[in-house]
C-alpha cells in the first residue's frame, strides 16, 4: 500500500513537465551521483560508506525515471518500431560494444604490470555480448535497451498504465529473470522507466497538486535513516528519492541564474557514464603513486573529490575534443552531427 501511495503521489505531484530543462538538471545531478557512487575504495571512512549507501538506494531508479520521461517527451509520432530499434542500437549498443572492447583490452594489456580490479581473460570479448563483462556498471545500458524494446509496444496512455501496473508487480516480487542480458536488472528497473513515461503522459495532472518541498525532504531523510541504520525501507526509498531530486532540480531551474555547468554535464551524461570508471581508475592510480596520503584519512575527502572530478571532467574533455570532433567517433558513440555542433548529448 505504501508503495502504491508513493507512486500515486509522484504521479500527481512532483514535476513541472512543461520545462525540459528540468530533466537536463535531473540528468546532471544523476550522473554526478553515479560517478560518486562508483568510487568506493576499500579503506573508505564510515561517513563515506554511508553516503555511498544513500546514493545507491535511489540513483539508478532516478536515471531510469528520467530516461522514461524523456523517451515520451521526445517520442516521434509515426516512427516505425523497426526504425526506432535500429536507432537505439546505434545510440546505445554500438557504444557499449566499443567501450567494452576498449576497457577489456586495457585490462588485458595492463594486468600483468599493475593491479587491475576485476581482471579478465580473452573470453571476455565473447561474454560482453550477453553480460557487462567490461564493467558491471554497464548493466544499465542492457536494461535500458530492453526498456526501449518493450515500451513502444504499449502505444497509448491507457496501455502504458497497464504496463505500469505489471511493472510494479514485477518490482514487488522476488527477481526470477536470469542475469544473462541483464534481464534481472530489467525486471527491477522497468517500473521506474514506465513511471517516468506515464508521468509525461499525464503531465497536465501532475502539475495540478503541490506538496511542500520540506515534506518531501523530511520523508526522504527519515527513510534514509531507517535504511542506513536498520537496512529497512528498500522498496520505498527509490520513489521518494526520485521525487526529492526532481523537486530539487525544479528549484534549481527556477532559481539559479546560471546553470550552464549542469546543462553541460547533462549534455555529455552518456559519455560520462561510459568512461567515468576509466578516468576514476586512472586518477586513483596517479594518487597512489604520487600522493598516497590523499587516499586515507584525514585527507580522504580531498582525494575523493579529485578522483570524482576526474570521473566527470575526463569524459567531458574526451567528448569535446575527440569524440564529437570526428565523423568516425561520432558514429561509433552515437553522436549526431548537429548534436556535436551544439555540444548537446540527448538522453539515450
Where are the regions that the model predicts?
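Alpha-helical transmembrane segments and their immediate juxtamembrane cytosolic regions
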Residues: 4-348
Amino acid at each position: 500500500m505504501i508503495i502504491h501511495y508513493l507512486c500515486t503521489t509522484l504521479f500527481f505531484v512532483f514535476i513541472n513537465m512543461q520545462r525540459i530543462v528540468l530533466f537536463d538538471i535531473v540528468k546532471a545531478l544523476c550522473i554526478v551521483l553515479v560517478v560518486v557512487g562508483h568510487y568506493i575504495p576499500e579503506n573508505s571512512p564510515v561517513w563515506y560508506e554511508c553516503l555511498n549507501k544513500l546514493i545507491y538506494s535511489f540513483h539508478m531508479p532516478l536515471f531510469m525515471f528520467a530516461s522514461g520521461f524523456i523517451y515520451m517527451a521526445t517520442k516521434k509520432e509515426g516512427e516505425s518500431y523497426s526504425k526506432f530499434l535500429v536507432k537505439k542500437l546505434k545510440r546505445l549498443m554500438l557504444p557499449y560494444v566499443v567501450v567494452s572492447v576498449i576497457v577489456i583490452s586495457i585490462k588485458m594489456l595492463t594486468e600483468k604490470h599493475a593491479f587491475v580490479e576485476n581482471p579478465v581473460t580473452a573470453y571476455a570479448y565473447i561474454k560482453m555480448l550477453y553480460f557487462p563483462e567490461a564493467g558491471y556498471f554497464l548493466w544499465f545500458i542492457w536494461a535500458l535497451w530492453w526498456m526501449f524494446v518493450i515500451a513502444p509496444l504499449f502505444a497509448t496512455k491507457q496501455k502504458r498504465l497497464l504496463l505500469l501496473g505489471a511493472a510494479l508487480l514485477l518490482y514487488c516480487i522476488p527477481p526470477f529473470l536470469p542475469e544473462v542480458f541483464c534481464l534481472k536488472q530489467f525486471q527491477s528497473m522497468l517500473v521506474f522507466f514506465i513511471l517516468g513515461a506515464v508521468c509525461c503522459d499525464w503531465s497536465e495532472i501532475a502539475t495540478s497538486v503541490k506538496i511542500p518541498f520540506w515534506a518531501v525532504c523530511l520523508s526522504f531523510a527519515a527513510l534514509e535513516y531507517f535504511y542506513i541504520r536498520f537496512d529497512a525501507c528498500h522498496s520505498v526509498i527509490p520513489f521518494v528519492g526520485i521525487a526529492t531530486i526532481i523537486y530539487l532540480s525544479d528549484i534549481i531551474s527556477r532559481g539559479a541564474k546560471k546553470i550552464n555547468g549542469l546543462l553541460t554535464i547533462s549534455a555529455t551524461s552518456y559519455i560520462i557514464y561510459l568512461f567515468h570508471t576509466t578516468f576514476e581508475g586512472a586518477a586513483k592510480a596517479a594518487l597512489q603513486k604520487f600522493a598516497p596520503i590523499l587516499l586515507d584519512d584525514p585527507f580522504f575527502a580531498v582525494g575523493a573529490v579529485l578522483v570524482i572530478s576526474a570521473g566527470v571532467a575526463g569524459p567531458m574533455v574526451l567528448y569535446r575534443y575527440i569524440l564529437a570532433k570526428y565523423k568516425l567517433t561520432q558514429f561509433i558513440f552515437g553522436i549526431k552531427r548537429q548534436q556535436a555542433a551544439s555540444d548537446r548529448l540527448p538522453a539515450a
